[in-house]
């Protein structure tokens, strides 16, 4: 696995196309966000979709990747039917530009694939092709990855490679417990990488409830795991969310003035105020992705 990562570093550092990309946009950085959760049913995908739309409404170039490889449903919320996914790129059947879908909500969408982890076993030539294809995403301002729920291996790969990780939970005791469990696994398995973890509390009835839940988790994480987790914000429990799911129209589009939409805008605004540090965007993502078995 480490050999594959080293090969990819060489390929991405020395190919003419990658050199041109650096020269053309040396100051451009792609922010890569992974949105995850300890359990299903907490609204993780809804958060990913609507955050992507909120970024697009700010004038950002946004790509949303469905990384929930077992129960992919981003396309359901967007009401699109993807004909191709990342597996066709991995198998060199399609180019990246051929699988990216434009959507009516202003974002681009890439469907995931159950075999995505196969890139760890690609030959040098196959890695070269995939690296060049994936590097095309470097023109985006924001890439949001909706991971699967829980601690599957591919979830940890996405978490390890992203610039920032947002763990979604709700006020339910089981969701809080599972959020802590997810953070524990991340810090145990990937602690040496100093993953940038933030909490997003969904379906709250007040700002105070969101803060109380986040404080509880952050305190326990600090006490028992000796790890710093930040609170990024909350989203109100509101009937417009379930109604938008039924209509397959994100609430940022159909109810832009609703409480949940305002919450998402506030969260995105807070994210935008944080520095990306030394991240190299898409190139850095691929290198880190291959390091995690």
What spans do the regions from the language model cover?
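Extreme N-terminal, non-catalytic leader segments
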Residues: 1-38
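Walker A/P-loop NTP-binding active-site region of P-loop NTPases
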Residues: 32-96
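P-loop/Walker-type NTP enzyme "switch/lid" segment
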Residues: 67-141, 191, 246
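Conserved C-terminal guanine-recognition region of P-loop GTPase G domains, centered on the G4
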Residues: 131-134, 176-194
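Inter-motif core of Ras-like GTPase G domains
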Residues: 133-138, 152-174
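G-domain G4 guanine-recognition motif of GTPases
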Residues: 170-171, 197-211, 234-241, 256
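Beta-strand-loop-alpha "switch" segments that mediate conformational coupling across diverse proteins
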Residues: 223-252, 263-266
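NTP-binding/hydrolysis catalytic cores, primarily Walker-type P-loop NTPases
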Residues: 248-293
């Amino acid at each position: 696995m480490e050999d594959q990562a080293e090969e990819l570093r060489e390929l991405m550092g020395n190919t003419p196309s990658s050199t041109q990309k650096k020269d053309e946009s040396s100051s451009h950085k792609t922010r890569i966000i992974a949105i995850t959760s300890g359990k299903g049913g907490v609204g993780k995908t809804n958060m990913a979709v609507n955050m992507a739309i909120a970024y697009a409404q700010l004038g950002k170039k946004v790509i949303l990747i469905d990384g929930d490889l077992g129960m992919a449903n981003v396309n359901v919320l967007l009401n699109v039917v993807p004909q191709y996914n990342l597996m066709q790129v991995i198998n060199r059947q399609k180019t990246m530009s051929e699988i990216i879908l434009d959507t009516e909500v202003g974002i681009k969408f890439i469907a995931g694939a159950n075999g995505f982890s196969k890139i760890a076993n690609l030959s040098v030539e196959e890695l070269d092709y995939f690296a060049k294809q994936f590097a095309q995403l470097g023109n985006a301002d924001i890439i949001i990855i909706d991971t699967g729920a829980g601690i599957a291996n591919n979830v940890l790969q996405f978490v390890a490679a992203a610039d920032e990780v947002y763990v979604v939970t709700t006020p339910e005791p089981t969701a809080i417990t599972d959020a802590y469990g997810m953070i524990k696994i991340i810090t145990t398995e990937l602690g040496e990488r100093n993953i940038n973890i933030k909490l997003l509390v969904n379906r709250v009835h007040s700002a105070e409830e969101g803060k109380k839940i986040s404080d509880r988790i952050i305190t326990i994480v600090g006490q028992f795991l000796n790890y710093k987790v930040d609170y990024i914000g909350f989203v109100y429990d509101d009937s417009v969310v379930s109604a938008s799911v039924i209509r397959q129209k994100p609430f940022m589009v159909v109810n832009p003035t609703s409480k949940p939409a305002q919450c998402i805008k506030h969260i995105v605004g807070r994210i935008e105020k944080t520095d990306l540090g030394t991240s190299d965007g898409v190139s850095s993502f691929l290198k880190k992705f291959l390091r995690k078995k």
